[in-house]
Design a protein with these regions (language model features):
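Short, small-residue-rich loop/turn micro-motifs
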Residues: 61-66, 133-138, 197-199
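Thr-Gly-centered strand-to-loop micro-motif
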Residues: 35, 72, 129, 205-206
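C-terminal, non-catalytic macromolecule-binding modules
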Residues: 112, 116-161
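Conserved SAM/AdoMet-binding glycine-rich loop
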Residues: 1-111, 122
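Terminal RNA-binding accessory module
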Residues: 144-206
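Hydrophobic, well-ordered secondary-structure elements that form the walls
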Residues: 60, 101, 121, 129, ...
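Structural beta-strand/beta-sheet cores of well-ordered domains, especially the beta-sheet scaffolds
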Residues: 28-31, 56-58, 96, 127-130, ...
Length: 206
């Protein structure tokens, strides 16, 4: 839980980020790899909005877009709470890119529940998805649940969401046609220089 870092010392992630950027002024960009939606407080959002060196990308695990599945997963939020949070972030930081983790085929996930998730993914307008078919882990509560999903069904659901991720990515990329992006160059080759934008999409400079 990245967002909980420092709590045992009574400091917040935002406090730590501020200190890093203050003590390392030459640091050009700071990106948070992944953070839970419940850990994105107003202080974090405001700091990200006001500090241009914070990458305009947030990877916020969702896991499921269906409330009944989230309850079985013991996730501490609802789809409505998740949606309201990412919309608040977009309102404050219009050029932000938001991606998520998704697990399909969690035990007892019905076709209707999966379709709810699929519709929610479209509603959220993510820039891309990290999709994982549920994998049984011995010793976990989920492993002992009845109605484990057939591997072929899990594969089909994962493929459908991966295809959606491609469409979402293309849509997001299209929004940047004709616009300037702030890119950190990571490789220089004959075919062009390559790097990532602040929104964490790859860029080739020919």
């Amino acid at each position: 839980h990245t967002g909980r870092y420092g709590r045992e010392f009574k400091v917040s992630l935002t406090d730590i980020m501020k200190r890093i950027l203050k003590e390392v002024p030459q640091l050009y960009r700071l990106r948070i790899s992944s953070i839970e939606v419940t850990e994105l407080d107003d202080d974090f959002i405001t700091f990200m909005k006001e500090e241009p060196r914070i990458a305009r990308h947030l990877h916020i695990p969702l896991q499921s877009g269906c409330d009944s599945v989230l309850q079985r997963m013991h996730r501490p939020y609802t789809t409505q709470e998740y949606y309201e949070k990412i919309e608040k972030i977009r309102e404050e930081i219009p050029d932000v890119s938001i991606s998520c983790d998704l697990i399909v085929g969690f035990p007892q996930e019905t076709e209707k529940e999966f379709e709810e998730t699929y519709a929610f993914l479209q509603k959220c307008r993510f820039s891309f998805l990290h999709v994982f078919p549920y994998s049984l882990r011995n010793g976990t509560v989920a492993a002992d649940m009845p109605c484990q999903i057939d591997p072929q069904i899990k594969k089909q659901r994962a493929q459908k969401c991966i295809a959606l991720s491609g469409k979402l990515y293309d849509t997001y990329q299209t929004q940047w046609i004709g616009k300037e992006a702030d890119v950190i160059v990571e490789q220089c080759k004959e075919e062009g220089s390559k790097g990532h934008s602040s929104q964490y999409f790859p860029v080739t400079i020919a």
